[in-house]
Amino acid sequence: MNLIDGKALAAKMQAELKVKVDKLKEAGSVPGLAVILVGEDPASQIYVRNKARQATAIGLNSSVVRLPETVSEKELLELIEQYNQSEQWHGILVQLPLPKHISEEKVLLAIDPEKDVDGFHPMNMGRLWAGNPLMIPSTPAGIMEMFREYNVELSGKRAVVIGRSNIVGKPMAQLLMMADATVTIAHSRTKNLRELTKEADILVVAIGRDRMIKADDVKDGAVVIDVGMNRDEDGKLHGDVDFDEVKEVASLITPVPGGVGPMTITMLMEQTVRAATRKMNENSN
């Protein structure tokens, strides 16, 4: 078993991004990331704090706007439009989930697709499925970087993705297909799941069930990517994969924490820098 060290790869990418940001600044462009947080969800506050910290570390101009839980949908949409129109901001991120009185669909649709660093706008989803992506959801994008860094061969391989969310499962499956893997999407209603997972050369698990995947579910030598984050009764973090068991049969595996998580935030930064570069090139033409 070899560990896929997401923390180390994220640090390496951050150093490379800082160099790119410095070059953009020399050329007169300061990449900007605007983050909007509605309400006081503790997990969301941690995520936003981590994103802002990393943005500052690589030299981005970052803004975090914290809005009360009671903010109206209209007010939120107006704020997004201000960021859309401003050339100061190249990436816009609205932290999910949102309060029930605000339509997530309307909010995601309101963000300029070229500034949608989360990759959740329907236009960006459509471009991904058409094989011509502009912005890609950051968790699957980070996983693809891991595959590149660790020289994981995808072409012709059998890949199983457990989970069908728009955030991870669906875009992950599409990226694997674009890399010429043969892909199966499984989910909570899939029957005979073990029959599928035992055939997978690449197994990506994003179903939100604590240590559900055991050694008996995994093919010898498989590459296992664990997207899950679950806390046990003692508050300890675990993935959807039973790491202690599965590491004995996998050729490569991501730990939780320290695997996929660090890469997710780094890819948000990468897409912000890419958006700023694209804008600068447009302006110079």
UniProtKB/Swiss-Prot annotation:
Keywords: Amino-acid biosynthesis, Histidine biosynthesis, Hydrolase, Methionine biosynthesis, Multifunctional enzyme, NADP, One-carbon metabolism, Oxidoreductase, Purine biosynthesis. The gene is folD. It comes from Lactococcus lactis subsp. cremoris (strain MG1363). It catalyses: (6R)-5,10-methylene-5,6,7,8-tetrahydrofolate + NADP(+) = (6R)-5,10-methenyltetrahydrofolate + NADPH; (6R)-5,10-methenyltetrahydrofolate + H2O = (6R)-10-formyltetrahydrofolate + H(+). Its EC number is 1.5.1.5, 3.5.4.9. One of its GO terms (biological process) is tetrahydrofolate interconversion. The lineage of its organism: Bacteria, Bacillati, Bacillota, Bacilli, Lactobacillales. The keyword Repressor does not apply. Belongs to the tetrahydrofolate dehydrogenase/cyclohydrolase family. Pathway: One-carbon metabolism; tetrahydrofolate interconversion. GO terms for molecular function: methenyltetrahydrofolate cyclohydrolase activity; methylenetetrahydrofolate dehydrogenase (NADP+) activity. This is Bifunctional protein FolD. One of its GO terms (cellular component) is cytosol. Homodimer. PANTHER family: C-1-TETRAHYDROFOLATE SYNTHASE, CYTOPLASMIC, C-1-TETRAHYDROFOLATE SYNTHASE, CYTOPLASMIC-RELATED. The keyword Lyase does not apply. NADP(+) binds at residues 163-165, 188. InterPro entries: Aminoacid_DH-like_N_sf (IPR046346), NAD(P)-bd_dom_sf (IPR036291), THF_DH/CycHdrlase (IPR000672), THF_DH/CycHdrlase_cat_dom (IPR020630), THF_DH/CycHdrlase_CS (IPR020867), THF_DH/CycHdrlase_NAD-bd_dom (IPR020631). It comes from the Bacteria.
